[in-house]
């Protein structure tokens, strides 16, 4: 329940809309990630190798999944209002955890640069791919 109100957060139209948007973000990102990993695995089984394109696509999907998770949690964090600031609120922990994920080298913004290079037919500029 948000601070200074008797209405449950789940009963507010704003929270309901944000939940819908967050759900669509997470589901779409999950499908993209699983699809890219399925394609990578199929390529590996068929050829014994993983192509640069498949690796770039999987890395892109992972980065997108993290960005989508951040956006989804941010939507809920804002909906929670000032209550989201308190350690007793589950949104506070989710906010910290999801933003901590953004600091991982595997989803660093530079990954988008490298995957973009591969998508444009250029060599990646990082050994991570």
Q: What are these model-derived regions, one by one?
A:
Residues 71-78, 109-113:
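Short segments within alpha-helical structural elements
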Residues 82-129:
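Glycine-rich phosphate/cofactor-binding loops in nucleotide/flavin-utilizing enzymes
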Residues 1-41:
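Extended amphipathic alpha-helical segments enriched in small hydrophobics
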Residues 7-10, 14-17, 24, 46-60, ...:
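A structural signal for alpha-helical segments
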Residues 69-75, 82, 91:
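A short pocket-lining beta-strand/turn micro-motif at the edge of beta-sheets
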Residues 20-27, 59, 63-70, 96-99, ...:
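Generic structural signal for well-ordered, non-transmembrane alpha-helical segments
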Residues 28-60, 77-85:
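C-terminal helix-coil-helix/basic helical segment that borders enzyme active sites and/or dimer interfaces
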């Amino acid at each position: 329940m948000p601070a200074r109100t008797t209405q449950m957060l789940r009963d507010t139209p704003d929270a309901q809309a944000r939940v819908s948007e967050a759900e669509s973000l997470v589901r779409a990102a999950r499908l993209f990630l699983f699809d890219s990993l399925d394609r990578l695995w199929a390529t590996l089984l068929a050829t014994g190798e993983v192509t640069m394109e498949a690796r770039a696509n999987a890395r892109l999907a992972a980065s997108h999944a993290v960005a989508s998770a951040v956006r989804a949690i941010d939507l809920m964090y804002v909906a929670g209002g000032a209550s989201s600031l308190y350690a007793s609120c589950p949104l506070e922990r989710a906010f910290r955890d999801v933003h901590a994920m953004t600091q991982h080298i595997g989803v660093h913004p530079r990954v988008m640069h490298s995957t973009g290079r591969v998508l444009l037919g250029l060599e990646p500029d990082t050994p991570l791919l």
